């Protein structure tokens, strides 16, 4: 009988999402397996080897297992002893599993996590429930007052395989968030469930290996020794609370688009509104596992970008755009940003106190993010010193946000002042300065500030401003040369947005050709196939896991697709359609709704949030911003995707 490959197991649902953090959907994999694997199933799962055409447990058995665990916890607090629960355990009638773990969480915080042996699965479950409830490692044993609000996860190990010595040193040997890890050195052993990569600071293979060695009482480099056994493990997780309880039903498998556009736009826009402070600004960096906001200074570029996304939403035909509360809160955000501006002697207005930190596309050092040293694994950003000259980026995005609709009506004078500053930032050669008051450009900032400044002019040109259009024309050749000399992903996101608009407005093929040149170059970094199917559709230059910057790159691809459709470029249209479909599947996995709700400290606060990566589930405000504008762009071409 043919066995099910690791790839088949993943494609069947174990890695079908960042819910892939938990292989919950393994339960339905028998219906999804490739034809080559359909006749049989061979999993290293204790006494139920080679189950033919069926998942490890039936739907009825799953329900009985989780019910037994929940009932055991209630009865133990009611004064029952484990011996009193044995008849219930035996009644389950399922043979012992290779390993059972019970994890208890309260408000997303782990309160206990233990395993226990047993003569059958029922005994393993009740014994593990007792041990988890008495676990002293996470704030002491579970107390009665918190029991009613405690979620429970039943983890069942359904497979394992040895990681050969040489393979341990390969890149991405583990499917992080999908597979667990086990180590054994002559009886000194320990294991991690798949969720550890999501909830801990150990977000790479190496850091997991080292931490697990320490847990087993071994030297942190013991995993490198050939006589030490290291195994990857596959698990099934049965949670007591489903995501649907907080986030509503999951997207139907037969849905025409991988992302529900209407609800995604509304929920992500409300995420920014819901997490505003009294000044109108939105939370910069949020950790949904700990339910805490990271205490960092805000970034003016990213704050203005969030307002731009909300402004674009207000100009759309979505129901949310007609909501009075949404209008008021968006205007409040605008006032907060304007309070951080100052007037110039030339009658302009600029945003002050801006950090020259990078935009999402600049942060893509694929392996650096999860491996960053330090307790909080903070994102690397350049801190702006006191008195540093104001950058063009935040001023440009604030101007773009105020350039139309109700915001332009309410802040007409402020917009004109901001616009004057942007027009004054263009140099005689057509390029833009990167910091007001300084003619020498910052090489890094030029890649994205120039596109943001040009976006303001492109939006004006679309409204019939011929002077703005002429300024775009003057900038065209210098920035074409800039890209050809040193192409970078940081440049493409904003410049494709700009020049696709100008190409459609003017019908000039030179602009269209430049858009297609950038997009074709960018798409070489899109992952077309990978053994970790979650990666497919994302973008990565170094071969590491794709990150949140994929959202920016996909929006550029969507805008290039719209241009290809308008210009009748059938070949590119077909290619871009396929790339956009694939990219949307990846971007969907970054939504916090794809994270098991039992891991989230406050699920309702998370609604609409978009994570930094498949494993790093923190939310930064500008990632939400780019997700909103991506969805708005997709709406323009969605009929070509279905």
Task: Place the predicted regions along the sequence by residue.
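N-terminal export signals
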Residues: 2, 8-31
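Basic nucleic-acid-binding interfaces
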Residues: 41-244
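Low-complexity, Ser/Thr/Pro/Gly-enriched N-terminal "stalk/linker" regions
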Residues: 246-301, 329-332, 336, 340-354, ...
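Well-ordered alpha-helical scaffold segments within catalytic/enzyme domains
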Residues: 251-258, 304-322, 396-410, 452-465, ...
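Solvent-exposed loop and edge beta-strand segments that line ligand/cofactor-binding
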Residues: 257, 289-304, 347-396, 411, ...
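Extended, well-ordered alpha-helical scaffold segments
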Residues: 257-272, 320-340, 390, 409-425, ...
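CBM-like carbohydrate-recognition segments
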Residues: 298, 368, 528-642
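Solenoidal tandem-repeat scaffolds enriched in leucines and small polar residues
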Residues: 421, 425, 430-451, 455-464, ...
């Amino acid at each position: 009988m043919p066995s099910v490959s690791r790839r088949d197991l993943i494609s069947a649902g174990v890695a079908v999402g960042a819910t892939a953090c938990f292989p919950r959907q393994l339960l339905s994999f028998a219906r999804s397996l490739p034809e080559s694997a359909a006749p049989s199933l061979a999993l290293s799962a204790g006494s139920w080897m080679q189950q033919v055409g069926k998942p490890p447990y039936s739907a009825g058995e799953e329900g009985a297992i989780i019910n037994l665990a929940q009932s055991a916890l209630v009865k133990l607090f009611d004064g029952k002893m484990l011996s009193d629960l044995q008849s219930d355990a035996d009644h389950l009638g399922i043979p012992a599993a290779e390993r059972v773990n019970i994890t208890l969480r309260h408000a997303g915080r782990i309160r206990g996590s233990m395993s226990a042996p047993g003569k059958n699965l029922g005994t393993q479950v009740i014994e593990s429930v007792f041990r988890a409830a008495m676990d002293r490692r996470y704030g002491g044993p579970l107390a009665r007052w918190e029991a009613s609000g405690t979620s429970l996860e039943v983890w069942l190990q359904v497979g394992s395989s040895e990681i050969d010595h040489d393979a341990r040193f390969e890149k991405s040997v583990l499917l992080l968030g999908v597979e667990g890890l086990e180590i054994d050195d002559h009886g000194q052993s320990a294991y991690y469930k798949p969720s550890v990569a999501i909830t801990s600071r150990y977000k790479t293979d190496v850091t997991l290996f080292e931490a697990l060695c320490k847990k087993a009482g071994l030297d942190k480099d013991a995993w490198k020794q050939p006589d030490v056994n290291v195994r990857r493990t596959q698990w099934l997780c049965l949670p007591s609370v489903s995501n649907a309880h907080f986030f509503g039903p999951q997207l139907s498998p037969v849905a025409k688009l991988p992302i529900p556009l209407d609800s995604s736009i509304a929920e992500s826009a409300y995420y920014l509104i819901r997490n505003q402070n009294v000044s109108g600004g939105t939370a910069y960096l949020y950790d949904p596992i700990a339910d805490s906001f990271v205490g960092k200074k805000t970034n003016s570029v990213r704050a203005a970008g969030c307002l731009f996304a909300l402004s674009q939403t207000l100009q759309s035909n979505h129901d949310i755009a007609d909501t009075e509360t949404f209008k008021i809160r968006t205007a409040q955000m605008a006032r907060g940003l304007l309070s951080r501006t100052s007037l110039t002697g030339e009658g302009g207005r600029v945003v002050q106190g801006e950090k020259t930190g990078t935009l999402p596309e600049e942060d893509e050092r694929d392996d650096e993010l999860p491996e960053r040293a330090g307790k909080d694994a903070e994102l690397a950003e350049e801190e702006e010193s006191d008195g540093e000259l104001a950058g063009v980026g935040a001023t440009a995005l604030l101007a773009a946000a105020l350039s139309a609709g109700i915001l332009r009506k309410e802040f007409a004078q402020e917009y004109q002042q901001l616009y004057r500053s942007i027009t004054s930032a263009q140099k005689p050669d057509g390029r833009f300065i990167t910091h007001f008051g300084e003619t020498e450009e910052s090489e890094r900032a030029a890649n994205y500030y120039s596109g943001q400044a040009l976006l303001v002019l492109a939006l004006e040109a679309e409204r019939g401003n011929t002077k703005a259009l002429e300024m775009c024309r003057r900038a065209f050749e210098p920035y074409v040369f800039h890209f050809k000399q040193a192409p970078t992903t940081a440049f493409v996101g904003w410049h494709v947005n700009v020049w696709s608009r100008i190409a459609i407005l003017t019908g000039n093929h030179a602009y269209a050709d430049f858009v297609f040149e950038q997009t074709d170059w960018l798409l070489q970094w899109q992952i077309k196939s990978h053994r970790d199917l979650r990666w497919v559709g994302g973008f990565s230059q170094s071969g590491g896991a794709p990150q949140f910057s994929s959202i920016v790159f996909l929006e550029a691809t969507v805008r290039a697709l719209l241009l290809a459709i308008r210009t009748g470029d059938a070949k590119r249209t077909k290619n871009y359609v396929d790339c956009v479909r694939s990219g949307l599947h990846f971007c969907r996995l970054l939504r916090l709704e794809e994270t098991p709700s039992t891991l989230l400290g406050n699920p309702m606060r998370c609604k609409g949030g978009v994570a930094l990566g498949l494993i790093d589930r923190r939310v930064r405000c500008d990632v939400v911003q780019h997700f909103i504008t991506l969805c708005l762009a997709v709406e323009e071409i969605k009929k070509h995707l279905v």
